[in-house]
UniProtKB/Swiss-Prot annotation:
Pfam families: Nitrophorin. This is Nitrophorin-7. GO terms for biological process: modulation of process of another organism; vasodilation; venom-mediated perturbation of biological process. Expressed in the endothelial cells of the salivary glands. Changing E47V: Results in the loss of the characteristic pH sensitivity of ligand binding. Reverses orientation of heme cofactor. One of its GO terms (cellular component) is extracellular region. Disulfide bonds join C25-C144, C62-C193. Keywords: Disulfide bond, Heme, Hemostasis impairing toxin, Iron, Metal-binding, Oxidoreductase, Platelet aggregation inhibiting toxin, Secreted, Signal, Toxin, Vasoactive, Vasodilator. It catalyses: 3 nitrite + 2 H(+) = 2 nitric oxide + nitrate + H2O. Forms oligomers (at pH 5.5). One of its GO terms (molecular function) is histamine binding. It comes from the Eukaryota. Its EC number is 1.7.6.1.
Length: 205
């Protein structure tokens, strides 16, 4: 099962739905040094390209989120859209930012489009976000899903402030450093994506 489905299963579906994930996350993931936190943890990020490390991944998803950081804690609103089922998913995540300033592990709740909690976070599951590179309007992150502290699946995500943009040279260079090829990624502008910018913008107020 692809990571996106697993992430949603943790908060929305039965936890048993995640059985069959590929296992350990990538080990060559290094957080960016001297990340400009004020710039990264602001505004809305759109996922323009992603690579699910599960070779059996088939479902397609669109993703956007609005992360905020204050006092060493990251709080973010997350929006997923399943292209196949045409279903939208709303979540909010919270977790501590590590001392390097570019990595955090969070648990997330299921909410409605107005941000009202529907289901609290399951303490058994968490996800770790590592900012590998961030430059101007683009970024590269790695997401790892854990169950009881053990890795169960991961993906790489190229972000941009513009939902239809291409990654800049710095992001492409970062991909090369972790031995990834952009042509292997799913390009979300080729999908019939739907976004809920109102949900994310309300989180920013």
């Amino acid at each position: 099962m692809e990571l996106y489905t697993a992430l949603l299963a943790v908060t929305i579906l039965s936890p048993s739905s995640i059985v069959g994930l590929p296992g350990e996350c990538s080990v060559n993931v290094i957080p960016k040094k001297n990340l400009d936190k004020a710039k990264f943890f602001s505004g809305t990020w759109y996922e323009t390209h992603y690579l699910d490390m599960d070779p059996q991944a088939t479902e397609k998803f669109c993703f956007s989120f609005a992360p905020r950081e204050s006092g060493g804690t990251v709080k973010e609103a997350l929006y997923h859209f399943n292209v196949d089922s045409k279903v939208s998913f709303y979540n909010t995540g919270t977790g501590p930012l590590e001392s390097n300033g570019a990595k955090y592990t969070a648990k997330f709740n299921t909410v409605d489009k107005k941000g009202k909690e529907i289901k609290p976070a399951d303490e058994k599951y968490s996800y770790t976000v590592t900012v590998i590179e961030a430059a101007k309007q683009s970024a590269l992150i790695h997401i790892c899903l854990q169950e009881d502290g053990k890795d169960i699946g991961d993906l790489y995500s190229v972000l941009n402030r513009n939902k239809n943009a291409l990654p800049n040279k710095k992001i492409k260079k970062a991909l090369n450093k972790v031995s990834l090829v952009l042509t292997k990624f799913v390009v979300t502008k080729d999908l019939d994506c739907k976004y809920d910018d109102k949900f994310l913008s309300s989180w920013q107020k």
